[in-house]
UniProtKB/Swiss-Prot annotation:
Species this protein is from: Arabidopsis thaliana
Disulfide bonds: none
Gene: AHA1
Active site, UniProt feature: D329 (4-aspartylphosphate intermediate)
Family, per entry: Belongs to the cation transport ATPase (P-type) (TC 3.A.3) family. Type IIIA subfamily.
Listed name of the protein: ATPase 1, plasma membrane-type
Location (main, coarse): membrane
Presence of the UniProt keyword Cytoplasm in the record: no
Membrane topology (Extracellular): 82-93, 265-273, 666-670, 731-751, 806-813
Enzyme class (EC, first level): translocase
Binding site for Mg(2+): D588, D592
One GO cellular component term: plasma membrane
Length: 949
């Protein structure tokens, strides 16, 4: 093993020496290693993965106390012991201990939840760990790349991320994308004997290689070792910071006003002033916000993984909630990717060849192992799959690649003659065979006929190789025939597309097939037939019919794109993003990686290549579109919970700051900082349960509308502050409650007033969560059981404190059950108007309030003739639509998009086109039924009531 230690210490240059010497130095053969040798070597070289930085658990725990919101609380704790002295009173130890407890509780919950989420994510990501084909014990098997050691023989094919530094063995040259390592944008050709680096992607070809370096000893490992990972501040973090800053600024304004009024104007005692400032600091900071939001996201991410969508980036959840356009691959996502060939429709273009021979040639030009869907269909059409290699000796197989779009087999027949067969895209095979114009015309006409029936075409050609070498170009190619391929739609695709449109997500089909096939599939799936060949939109030869319309608008209105190349996918995403859409893109191949990276949500479908998975944000573990739509719904529910909480947090900051500030300044009443601390602890304990609350997801794409969050928070918080001020005034300055409810007066007893205000603030503050969590009336939408139980327990504790407490240090005394009942009645009565305020804010912010006030009221308008011409035009257009003179879909073509409500109009228009396509199909069916009935002499009227259109 001393030789292997030299290799580990890099004293032997395995990159330059001849390949045979590599085997000698590594003490291995072309037959690979045994399992035992692999285990022995992993002890020497270590696992084939980069070293992960070990994070100190204690530092991670303390990290949850190191953010702007925590700093404010920590400042309050220091104030409680450092500044809160004077009047011969000791420092405020109760508040200090209470604040520290609150910080520790929050950090503990955050730490535990993040740890659990991290462990769950690690377990899920382990399932996505790079796999590789390795030769061990003389057998090829798929193993995790982490087990590789120098000396292993691996197989590299199109779409693979190369798992370790290796030297290529015999075979065709590889095209490798090294851009992740070297920044070279173009793929590099690597010949047998040359080195390939870990982390680069195979773009073309297939070959075996011997591993020479793994883990931290690879080129990639050394580079990663030198570069420290940079922490990019995500959108979610920016939103969190904005909300935190808003709350801190609100508190700062309140504190500034209190300091100016209390000391220079009112000449209050120093210690009383400090206590009032502590009330604002402790009560106003939403200390639980980072915890609640990260826990909500972690729980949501786990739920998504149970539905078959693994989130690689946690914040992809919020983007998924806002997604309004989904570009979906046709093959495998909208269809089953289970191809079949109708033998009767096979077309032969070569004399002396039967249809069965065309099928045999196609099967010969296919893999018999490690097959893709087309290979499996071709070989599966034979009576016995072994026929694909019967009586011939395989010399060389050219695998499929996105450039040539074909496969080929060079073989020797039983007579010793060399031949080559190829199957692939008809255009490529026609060019290969240098087809005459008349043959080309016949073939293209045949392809169009197939396409009208939704069938894809596969062409087959053959040639003789007189030179008898695999490298020789061979004789002229002969175009043999065309095969029709049928890929049936998934049984749930049509229903899922309908659901997506109802959710405001416009699904656009992306297919490499012809336009006619795309339209036929779109018609079958009920998604409309407004499709374009991507070359006509994005290529150099743009269609003259649509040249006058902006490309962005055409892409936005399209139901799908045909003849799509990977580079077109990137352009489609880019153009949609320029129109302010949140775009999701599905992909599976190595060439989809740029588009997946560019999209707001890159979705790697089930069985995607390593390269596609690496570039995506979400990896699906199950096939089909329904997984994506379920993930959209779940993401919106998660996002809704987060939004509900942020509105609540902003409202509470406003109500605490301005409510207690007004009470302190108008009546010079000093509320106890300790009682605010009790409110904060009970509130935070309850609010943690919102991460599992039952919510109604938004019916349209959703996003962080900070204007709406702040406006709602200010109005609801302001309303609650005013209600508390009115309650205090009524209890302190009037006998209203004594006269109306028969309770004893507490107007001159400050300690009992403290208990009464505490209970009123506690109830209405915590009940606010039911207003912010609902889209309609809060008493109609049932909350989750956990939230309800937590609320009841918290308010029971708050009521018992208010009724029985006798804490001299907190200046609070029990008020009895009579007052508690009165406060509950007051809180319930003042609770209901909050729903009305919530609806009013939403209506005003939507812009419709101003539009109806100014644009449609002639007294306020500035339009010529009071806008009579515009109103007449609107009426005429409505009448034309009503009487069928103008199709409904032509009305309201893409206004300026200012809101998600307008953005979802693209989905509404797609829905209308889909309905027209469906009715057209039914209309065709009805005509067909009537003609058959006439031929058969049936009574159509009796048959008519069996179906409706």
């Amino acid at each position: 093993m001393s030789g292997l230690e030299d290799i580990k210490n890099e004293t032997v240059d395995l990159e330059k020496i001849p390949i045979e010497e590599v085997f000698q130095q590594l003490k291995c053969t072309r037959e690979g290693l045994t399992t035992q040798e692999g285990e022995d070597r992993i002890v020497i070289f270590g696992p084939n993965k980069l070293e992960e930085k070990k994070e100190s658990k204690i530092l991670k725990f303390l990290g949850f106390m190191w953010n702007p919101l925590s700093w404010v609380m920590e400042a309050a704790a220091l104030m409680a012991i450092a500044l809160a002295n004077g009047d011969n009173r000791p420092p405020d130890w109760q508040d200090f201990v209470g604040i520290i407890c609150l910080l520790v509780i929050n950090s503990t919950i955050s730490f535990i939840e993040e740890n659990n989420a991290g462990n769950a994510a690690a377990a899920l990501m382990a399932g996505l760990a790079p796999k590789t084909k390795v030769l061990r014990d003389g057998k090829w098997s798929e193993q995790e790349a982490a087990i590789l050691v120098p000396g292993d023989i691996v197989s590299i094919k199109l779409g693979d991320i190369i798992p370790a530094d290796a030297r290529l063995l015999e075979g065709d040259p590889l095209k490798v994308d090294q851009s992740a390592l070297t920044g070279e944008s173009l793929p590099v050709t690597k010949h047998p004997g040359q080195e390939v680096f870990s982390g680069s992607t195979c773009k073309q070809g297939e070959i075996e290689a011997v591993v020479i370096a793994t883990g931290v000893h690879t080129f990639f490992g050394k580079a990663a070792h030198l570069v420290d990972s940079t922490n990019q501040v995500g959108h979610f973090q920016k939103v969190l910071t904005s909300i935190g800053n808003f709350c801190i600024c609100s508190i700062a304004i309140g504190i500034a006003i209190e300091i100016v009024v209390m000391y220079p104007i009112q000449h209050r005692k120093y210690r009383d002033g400090i206590d009032n400032l502590l009330v604002l600091l402790i009560g106003g900071i939403p200390i639980a916000m980072p915890t609640v939001l990260s826990v909500t996201m972690a729980i949501g991410s786990h739920r998504l993984s149970q539905q078959g969508a693994i989130t690689k980036r946690m914040t992809a959840i919020e983007e998924m909630a806002g997604m309004d356009v989904l570009c979906s691959d046709k093959t495998g996502t909208l269809t089953l990717n289970k191809l079949s060939v109708d033998k009767n429709l096979v077309e032969v273009f070569c004399k002396g060849v039967e249809k069965d021979q065309v099928l045999l040639f196609a099967a010969m030009a296919s893999r018999v192992e490690n097959q893709d869907a087309i290979d499996a269909a071709m070989v599966g059409m034979l009576a016995d799959p072994k026929e694909a290699r019967a009586g011939i000796r395989e010399v060389h197989f050219l695998p499929f690649n996105p450039v040539d779009k074909r496969t080929a087999l060079t073989y020797i027949d039983s007579d010793g003659n060399w031949h080559r067969v190829s199957k692939g895209a008809p255009e490529q095979i026609l060019d290969l065979a240098n087809a005459r114009p008349d043959l080309r015309k016949k073939v293209l006409s045949c392809i169009d006929k197939y396409a009208e029936r939704g069938l894809r075409s596969l062409a087959v050609a053959r040639q003789v190789v007189p030179e008898k070498t695999k490298e020789s170009p061979g004789g002229p190619w002969e175009f043999v025939g065309l095969l029709p391929l049928f890929d049936p739609p998934r049984h749930d695709s049509a229903e899922t597309i309908r659901r997506a449109l109802n959710l405001g997500v416009n699904v656009k089909m992306i297919t490499g097939d012809q336009l006619a096939i795309g339209k036929e599939t779109g018609r079958r799936l009920g998604m409309g037939t407004n499709m374009y060949p991507s070359a006509a939109l994005l290529g150099t030869d743009k269609d003259s019919n649509i040249a006058s319309i902006p490309v962005e608008e055409l892409i936005e209105k399209a139901d799908g794109f045909a003849g799509v190349f990977p580079e077109h996918k990137y352009e489609i995403v880019k153009k949609l993003q320029e129109r302010k859409h949140i775009v999701g893109m599905t992909g599976d191949g190595v060439n989809d990686a740029p588009a997946l990276k560019k999209a707001d949500i890159g979705i790697a479908v089930a069985d995607a290549t390593d390269a596609a998975r690496g570039a995506s944000d979400i990896v699906l573990t199950e096939p089909g579109l329904s997984v994506i739509i379920s993930a959209v719904l779940t993401s919106r529910a998660i996002f809704q919970r987060m939004k509900n909480y942020t509105i609540y947090a902003v409202s509470i900051t406003i109500r605490i700051v301005f409510g207690f500030m007004l009470i302190a300044l108008i009546w010079e009443f000093d509320f106890s900082a300790f009682m605010v601390l009790i409110i904060a602890i009970l509130n935070d304990g309850t609010i943690m349960t919102i991460s599992k609350d039952r919510v109604k997801p938004s019916p349209t794409p959703d996003s962080w509308k900070l204007k709406e969050i702040f406006a709602t928070g200010i109005v609801l918080g302001g309303y609650q502050a005013i209600m508390s001020v009115i309650f205090f005034w009524a209890a302190h300055k009037t006998d209203f409650f004594s006269d109306k409810f028969g309770v004893r007066s507490i107007r001159d007893n400050n300690d009992e007033l403290m208990g009464a205000v505490y209970l009123q603030v506690s109830i209405i503050s915590q009940a606010l969560i039911f207003v912010t969590r609902s889209r309609s009336w809060s008493f109609v939408e049932r909350p989750g059981a956990l939230l309800m139980i937590a609320f009841v327990i918290a308010q029971l504790v708050a009521t018992l404190i208010a009724v029985y407490a006798d804490w001299t240090f907190a200046k609070v005394k029990g008020i009895g059950w009579g007052w508690a009942g009165v406060i509950w009645i007051y809180s319930i009565v003042t609770y209901f108007p909050q729903d009305i305020l919530k609806f009013a804010i939403r209506y005003i912010l939507s812009g419709k309030a101003w539009a109806s006030l100014f644009d449609n009221r002639t007294a306020f308008t500035t339009k010529k003739d009071y806008g009579i011409g515009e109103r007449e035009a609107q009426w005429a257009q409505a009448q034309r639509t009503l009487h069928g003179l103008q199709p409904k879909e032509d009305v309201n073509i893409f206004p300026e998009k200012g809101s998600y409500r307008e953005l979802s109009e693209i989905a509404e228009q797609a829905k209308r086109r889909a309905e027209i396509a469906r009715l057209r199909e039914l209309h065709t069916l009805k005509g067909h039924v009537e003609s058959v009935a006439k031929l058969k002499g049936l009574d159509i009227d009796t048959a008519g009531h069996h179906y409706t259109v």
